[in-house]
Amino acid sequence: MNRLDDPTALFALLCEARVGGRFWADPAGLARPAAIVVRPRRIDDISGHLDCMEPAERRAALWIAPSAGRQPAQVFDRLVAAEGGAWRGDVDPWSALDGAESLVAHGDDEWVALARFAGTPVQILSPGRFGTPGDDIAELDQQAARALGETTYRDPFSGEEASITATIDLLAEWRRILEANRSIAAACGMAWWKRAEIHRFLWNPQRSLRIVARPSRALTVARRAGGGVAIWPSRVSPMLIETARRQDVPLIRVEDGFVRSVGLGSGLVPPSSVVVDRLGIHFDPSAPSDLEHILATTEFTPRLLARSSALRATIVAAGISKYGAGATVAPPPRQDGRRLVLVPGQVEDDMSVLAGGGGLTSNLELLRRARALEPDAEIWFRPHPDVDAGHRKGAVIDGDAMGVANRIVRGPGMAALLDCVDAVHVLTSLTGFEALLRGREVTCHGTPFYAGWGLTRDLGVVPDRRGRRLTLDELVAGVLILYPRYLDPVTGLPCPPEVLVKRMATDTARNRLGWIAPLRRWQGRLMAALR
């Protein structure tokens, strides 16, 4: 049982989060707020309601049908045709109660409690858990608070008892995701092996997401539904983007998150985190993105920054990077008294390199530029794992790399390497952000998403949009908490980043397509041998 020390504050929290009741249902879609919201228990209740209402109230009423189906629809169609007002079926209660002057309902209807959370006056028709005819506002509020306090809440990820505030926070995040997903009608460019996760990330309870192969079909589906198309940027053509612009169909870009999975995407490991961006995409500095907007405008609260700091500490302590917890192989010894710089290679035709590299795409050239800036340093070169696996472009012959670097490091996990170096030189690699988490110096030769906020040495062209100076915890809050979405690999539910990080740290983030990994490794070795 939850002890409610301040019901008023809790009501305000619920009202702000707009959770409780069937909040995942479609919004009421009212042109103006309803003067009175009426909730009959059964169809045959309607005549009794009408007897208690003035003609003006009937004309301004919003009727909520007690059940779905053809017969109720016909009854309410005739009702509003004769009396005025409007009716809705299964709707989000918060959207129906917005601005309403009163609610008329039975005492066992949870809408009574929701109305009181929202501060809406209520008329009770019959006694029940949430009120009795004649109850005043204070009595109704006590009943609503009692109902909240008598409920036991459980964390869906751990099964342990949870506080009501933690439950509200989780439901509020789910609501935010669902509302964002309502405008997505179709998806295109989604690889077959990640489609199950894409369905979960973009789930809409009222409309199944159509994932289609042909861009023209995706645009047709979206136009008919009045929605947008979710795309994977590297798997769609410029023609789709131009056609969508001409047809005024919004494109929503979906890309891997920054703490992604245990295993490589090129190894067909489905993502446990993605970003869903309506403005652009984080790796393209030529245009605004949702991440840029978040970092430039968010008022970071002390509570959010404390959460960000704790998340960063957990990630660093557990040795987690984009593709999971680091390997147990220890890094090689470094030279005593000499500055140690890590240069991570990238996939040379990766979209982040093409968009944010400022024309530089060569891993060998990146190494040379790092050496020019660090003539006395010990430099370690880390080939990109997708390239080393033989799946992607960007291989540097070891002899060429050793003509510039002091060592090529492949075995240890990235987190372990970052723990032992002094600085990192990157083009646009996520490794630069992971280095910032660990307090390392970062030099950006391109313009990654974390450049331009006052935390890196920036050699690339930084957009004026990034003039704000951020602390590390503010950057982490935007990049890891506010921008991405996460799926719990155990339950399949949307989760906070802390849950996924814990699964990775405890080795419970298993790949559902583990059977295909050996095949992909064999394919990668074959492709590497043929190059």
Language-model region placement:
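Leloir-type glycosyltransferase catalytic cores
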Residues: 1-36, 132-192, 265-335, 454-531
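Short loop/turn segments at strand-loop or loop-helix junctions that form parts
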Residues: 38-41, 65-67, 126-127, 255-256, ...
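A donor-sugar binding/catalytic signature common to diverse glycosyltransferases
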Residues: 93-132, 231-240, 255, 411-456
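Segments forming glycine/polar-rich beta-alpha architectures that bind adenosine-containing cofactors
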Residues: 199, 208-270, 321, 358-359, ...
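A short, well-structured beta->alpha microelement
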Residues: 21-28, 51, 66-67, 77-96, ...
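Catalytic donor nucleotide-activated moiety binding site of glycosyltransferases and closely related
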Residues: 57-90, 367-410
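Short, charged N-terminal beta->alpha structural module
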Residues: 9-11, 46-55, 68-78, 178-212
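Histidine-anchored nucleotide/phosphate-binding helix
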Residues: 42-63, 240, 356-373
